[in-house]
């Protein structure tokens, strides 16, 4: 019998892990859960961080105690399904401020393990976010690049909004401003750039379809040797 290629086995393992997390979530009062998504590219704060092609993303979370969450995700692209282009890990603590507002503190790590050049952009981050129901979120983050020779802590501000329209369709909006250090993403000097997105989202029964227009300021940095602008982003996702 012909053996299944290793890269395909790895992709199947990631997807099965996500599906298993979702099944456990149903059995254990949603203490576990997950999602699988297909996106047209991989965008982080307005910057394309991987080749501009279809990306498979899998994510899972665990709620070990009231208010606490642990989550992880992986992004894969063809043809190297056995080599993730991005991985993330997050621990969070949330508090209800009242019946409308919630605050969450998070520690995050973003890894880009494709090669030595992309690993330079591995990022560690701490953030505080305030959310009004599921409609509006403000966040303040500080981050640096631990693998870079010199990497001071930088600050980013983000606001996102979800405006319900009709028939499970909503307007998705976002805007942010982030500082980048000198020599990051090919920049000759440090600076601050702005980014945002506007789009439509359809959500029903665990399925999500989304199309967004990505907007960035003229001085937006680019990953060295990486892709250029990606003005449109499409997503199909299924949560479990």
Where are these regions (language model features)?
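Short glycine/proline- and aromatic-enriched beta-strand/turn motifs that initiate or cap beta-hairpins
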Residues: 29-79
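Outer-membrane beta-barrel "beta-signal"
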Residues: 163, 198-208, 213, 226-240
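Transmembrane beta-strands of outer-membrane beta-barrel pores
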Residues: 38-44, 74-80, 109-113, 132-134, ...
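Detector for outer-membrane/organellar transmembrane beta-barrel domains
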Residues: 119-184
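Repeated loop/turn-to-beta-strand initiation elements of outer-membrane beta-barrel proteins
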Residues: 32-34, 66-72, 98-105, 134-140, ...
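Residue-level signature of outer-membrane beta-barrel architecture
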Residues: 40, 62-64, 93-95, 101, ...
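Cleavable N-terminal export/targeting peptides
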Residues: 1-33, 240
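Residues that define the transmembrane beta-barrel architecture of outer-membrane proteins
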Residues: 52-56, 83-87, 101, 120-124, ...
